[in-house]
From Swiss-Prot:
Present with 4280 molecules/cell in log phase SD medium. There is a cross-link at K671 (Glycyl lysine isopeptide (Lys-Gly) (interchain with G-Cter in ubiquitin)). It comes from the Eukaryota. This is Cell membrane protein YLR413W. InterPro entries: SUR7/Rim9-like_fungi, SUR7_domain. It comes from Saccharomyces cerevisiae (strain ATCC 204508 / S288c) (Baker's yeast). PANTHER family: CELL MEMBRANE PROTEIN YLR413W-RELATED. It is a multi-pass membrane protein. Induction: By anaerobic conditions.
Length: 675
């Protein structure tokens, strides 16, 4: 084919590459129509996994989504009621209550049951009760355990309303108030209370010894030593026989014991000394002898239950600040016939105190709390629902504080609160929605809240679009867009109707759980786009020069081999620039796609067909130009070889003729001359 035809064709194809690259680059750097449809890629968040990205919002959407499944309910119905309180002080506590729901069904059920209490308002007694309960929760280091214990305690109190039961409760609480170690005291009381009636009866002699003691601590230690010693029966018989004789004759029991003590083995010395202490610290040696004789006769000193009881009693005496009161109280508890209910309350108290960071403070709070609840019958019937709500919360302290704030607000804003209450009631009557159902609802919810769901990413701009892909707006052109997906999503949510709810829940940019492959790779995005943009610019520049070069050469009648090589060199670079630019942009897109897929946020990344169509078409045309130039160069080279060969033949023929002429004979020359 004539190169004069091929050169203009190559110029036209180069012009096409030039224009396609310019349009692709301009489309992805501008924000005016119609080239806004040309972009690198877009991110569709219409079905984003909200519960994963914003866990705080998950339970809220579950509640609202469940309400949406009710008959004749629309997004406007649900979120319209929520918008009505968006500017009030009730929004934050309500959202925190729902957000803290570890068990959505239990939370909803409890809230609807507690709603009448909120509408009734509060009085001084209710406020005092709430304050005490709030203080109790604040001191907790394990709120779940504390709530379980307090719930059990209240249940036990409500089922045991006898005066005896109330007296026992007061006795226990008094012991705890006087204790330097409320937890240790409670556990020791549980040990004593778990004993059978027969075992408790056997402890009566012990209390008789304490009643006649001048030093309760010394007496207790001495008894514990005796119980933990093994004394031969013969030694015991000899000891008590001598003591009876000595006391009958008006002698001193202590001296008698000391005389006998010198005759016993060293292993029994501590036990003998303990007996001496008992007689030294008593107000009546005869009473002490009688009690000890009874204890030995009934084998109390060797009883395992008695030994355990003595250990618990010793601990109680060590912890108390009033030993006399303690012994009286423990004796009354031991003689009580309501041991089972008392034990349940003690176990509940132990659970409460163990879950508290300050047991002494809790001990002072519980009597006040019990008293207020016992006297406030209106509030008392809501207590089970209150504990159910707090037990279903991941942060009971925050939930209780939120409930108190809502109660105060609803008291004076019942009309505004009622629509929201209806939504909660409708949600509690519906089956909790599944994650798949929530996913299908997400697009309509995002659209209602005016949150852009399509993000079109170009080189210098970011465009936001509705679900139907009509544009919200585009950013002004500036430096290469950063693929910081967290910032992109957060900034757009900040500009939507969802902002009040974000503020109410104190959700900041760093609270968005968008960590993963996509976010980790964002630092590679800007350098890659810059490199691709540089390739495009180089492609445009070299295409322009090649196009001009081709047009100029098309006017020549002959194109030398060197010029063809120059054309091929330039065309090769155009192919490289165009191919690299297209490849880098494709790699960027696939990088975002794979990152999004691995992160599993249900964000769909897709490329722009017009953009990649323009880029790769430009590359194909550049390759065609290179092939045409290569063909022309090859044809030119072959043509030059033929010309050289013909020239060589002509030169050879000319040389041959000259030689023949030089060797012609003189006769032939004369004949030729004659002619």
């Amino acid at each position: 084919m004539n190169f004069k035809i091929l050169l203009p064709i190559c110029a036209l194809l180069t012009l096409t590459t030039f224009l396609l690259t310019i349009i692709a680059t301009a489309g992805s750097t501008s924000n005016y129509k119609p080239i806004t449809n040309i972009y690198i890629g877009d991110a569709d968040i219409s079905k984003i996994n909200v519960t994963k990205v914003m866990p705080q919002v998950g339970p809220i959407l579950t509640v609202l989504g469940s309400a949406l499944t009710a008959p004749n309910t629309t997004v406007d119905t649900i979120f319209g009621a929520l918008k009505a309180i968006a500017s009030t002080e009730a929004l934050s506590p309500l959202l925190h209550l729902l957000s803290n729901a570890a068990n959505t069904s239990a939370t909803l059920s409890s809230l609807t049951q507690l709603a009448p209490m909120a509408l009734l308002g509060t009085n001084t007694a209710t406020t005092t009760t709430f304050s005490a309960l709030d203080e109790l929760l604040t001191t907790s280091k394990n709120t779940t355990e504390l709530l379980d214990g307090f719930s059990t305690l209240m249940s036990s109190m409500s089922t045991n309303t006898s005066s005896t039961s109330a007296s026992l409760e007061n006795t226990v609480l008094t012991l705890l108030v006087d204790s330097t170690n409320p937890i240790g005291t409670t556990e020791s009381l549980i040990t004593l209370n778990n004993m059978t009636t027969e075992e408790k009866t056997k402890l009566s002699p012990v209390f008789e010894l304490f009643a006649s003691s001048k030093n309760i601590t010394a007496t207790c230690d001495a008894l514990e030593t005796i119980m933990n010693s093994t004394i031969p029966t013969s030694t015991v018989s000899s000891l008590f026989s001598s003591l009876k004789t000595s006391l009958a004759e008006g002698g001193n029991a202590t001296e008698t014991i000391m005389q006998l003590g010198s005759l016993v083995p060293s292993s029994l010395k501590p036990a003998v000394q303990a007996v001496v202490t008992l007689f030294d610290e008593t107000t009546s040696q005869n009473v002490t002898l009688s009690v000890l004789s009874t204890m030995i006769a009934e084998n109390i000193t060797q009883s395992s239950s008695a030994k355990a009881a003595m250990g618990a009693l010793t601990d109680l005496l060590n912890y108390t600040t009033n030993q006399t009161e303690l012994l009286t109280s423990v004796e009354s508890l031991a003689l009580s016939k309501e041991a089972a209910s008392s034990t349940n309350q003690l176990v509940a108290l132990d659970e409460i105190l163990s879950a508290s960071a300050n047991a002494s403070t809790v001990v002072s709070i519980i009597p006040t709390l019990e008293s207020q609840l016992a006297n406030n019958t209106v509030l008392l019937k809501y207590v089970p629902y209150l504990f159910s709500l707090l037990a279903a919360s991941s942060d009971p302290v925050s939930s209780f504080s939120s409930l108190v704030n809502i109660t105060k607000w609803a008291e004076t804003n019942a009309a505004t609160f009622m629509p929201m209450l209806k939504i909660l009631n409708s949600a509690v009557n519906m089956t909790t929605i599944t994650p798949e159902q929530l996913k299908e609802m997400t697009p309509s919810i995002l659209e209602y809240l005016h949150i852009p769901v399509i993000y079109r990413l170009s080189i210098f701009t970011m465009c936001r679009a509705h679900l139907n892909r009509t544009m919200y707006s585009c950013s002004k052109s500036h430096a290469v867009q950063n693929m910081d997906f967290r910032s992109i999503v957060y900034n757009n949510i900040e500009g939507s109707d969802f902002k009040p709810y974000m503020d109410a829940l104190n959700i900041g940019k760093d609270d968005l759980h968008l960590d993963g492959e996509l976010q980790d790779r964002q630092h590679m995005y800007v350098p890659a786009v810059k490199a691709a943009l540089a390739m495009n610019l180089m492609c445009i520049i070299t295409s322009f020069f090649l196009m001009v070069f081709l047009l100029l050469l098309s006017r020549r009648s002959v194109v030398s081999q060197k010029l063809w090589l120059a054309l091929g060199f330039i065309s090769c670079w155009i192919c490289i620039f165009s191919g690299l630019g297209s490849t880098i942009f494709s790699v960027i897109l696939n990088m975002m796609k794979s990152g999004s897929k691995k992160d599993n946020y249900d964000v769909i990344i897709s490329g722009s067909s017009p953009f990649y169509g323009l880029m790769w078409s430009g590359f194909v045309f550049a390759v065609l130009v290179f092939l045409c130039i290569a063909y022309c160069w090859w044809s030119s080279r072959k043509g030059a070889a033929i010309v050289e060969a013909e020239k060589a033949v002509q030169e050879s023929d000319s040389t041959t003729s000259r030689i023949i002429e030089e060797h012609e004979s003189p006769i032939d020359a004369e004949k030729n001359f004659a002619r």
